[in-house]
Structure formats: C-alpha cells, structure tokens
Amino acid sequence: MAKTHEIKAERRADEGKGASRRLRHAGVIPAIVYGGELEPVSIQLNHEQIWLAQQNEWFYSSILDLNLNGDVQQVLLRDIQRHPFKQLIMHIDFQRVSANQKLSAAVPLHFINEEASPAGKSSEVVVTHELNEVQVVCLPKDLPEFIEVDLGALEVGNVIHLSEIKLPAGVEIPELKLGKERDVAVVAAKHVRIQEEDAAGEEGSEGAETK
C-alpha cells in the first residue's frame, strides 16, 4: 500500500457562491467530501497547505487521510477546479473510500532505464511515451502511488503494450477486459526516418481531406 498523506479540513457552515467567495478571499478553499455510507459534507481547506500538496504526484493518485475536525476519513481526490489565470484553487471534490470496496483511479507511469536501453542509446531512435498514466481497479490497500515501466531492454522498433505492464499484486487494468483493441501502445521506439515518414503520411492525409 502506498504511503498515505494527511489533509486537514474543517466543516463549512455557510454555502453558496457568496460564502465561497468570502472563503477564497480569506485563503480558504471550499470543498466537499462524499461517498461511502455517509452523507456528503461541505468542508473547507487551507489554501496554502493544498497549494503545496497539489504540486506533488501523490496528491492525485494516493489515498489521502482527510482529518475533518479530528475525524480521519480515507479519501481520493476526484476533482480540482483552478482559476484560469490566477494561482488559485477554486473548489475540490474528495470521495470516501471503503477498505473492502474496489476503487477506480488513474495511476502515473514512471519510465525507468530508458537511457540505458539499446533504443535509448541510439541517436537515430525516438522513444515515445504514448501514455503517462493508466486507469486501474483495486482495493484501497493495493493502490500504488505509481507504476514503474522498465525500458531497459527496449530495442529499435519495439512497442510496449498495456498488457505488458507489470502490475502490483491486486491491481487490474479494466480496459484489457474490453477486447484486444484496447491493448494500446504505451511506449514506442521508432527509427527517426520511420517517424518522419509517419508524420509526412499523416500530413498528406489531412491535406487530401481538406481539398
């Protein structure tokens, strides 16, 4: 199980746009926590703490310990709304998780040993990461903070598919149960010449369609 991280919160008494605006001016983020067998609860968070937390990968993919006035609930971040141009978080949604109920979450992929691989050592090869995260299903205790993809043996022309990712125990990729066409490429190592030919072919197709 990935390490959990504590987020402090307080119950929010006032609701509505006016109340939310006042909270933001005071350096507080309006938020909500829902799910499980409990009713949704309007809460508020310290903007400075959350601003620092949201700069870390774990904030988006880990089980969080939401400390709500001393009552600790395990939650996942489900939505974060940001101001379009200010360094300001507008609202956050958390979902409670149950220890015995599987959850769905997006987990980041960490690519390792790429530079040491045959493909990575070649100046004539472009290694493309087609996916940077993957949707998984598992129990909360099994949720990984990230999944490593070892590229140490990557050769020129190789393609690593979703089904080839080594998953931690108890973790599944639901997309793979929906058919072979869902077994998409995660990493591709192409010779630069082939990469350029593919790009030229796509541009030609687009030009033909616009005529």
From Swiss-Prot:
Residues 1-18 have a biased composition (Basic and acidic residues). InterPro entries: Rbsml_bL25/Gln-tRNA_synth_N, Ribosomal_bL25/Gln-tRNA_synth, Ribosomal_bL25_b-dom, Ribosomal_bL25_C, Ribosomal_bL25_long, Ribosomal_bL25_short, Ribosomal_L25_dom, Ribosomal_uL5_bac-type. It comes from the Bacteria. It holds the Pfam family Ribosomal_L25p. Belongs to the bacterial ribosomal protein bL25 family. CTC subfamily. This is one of the proteins that binds to the 5S RNA in the ribosome where it forms part of the central protuberance. This is Large ribosomal subunit protein bL25.
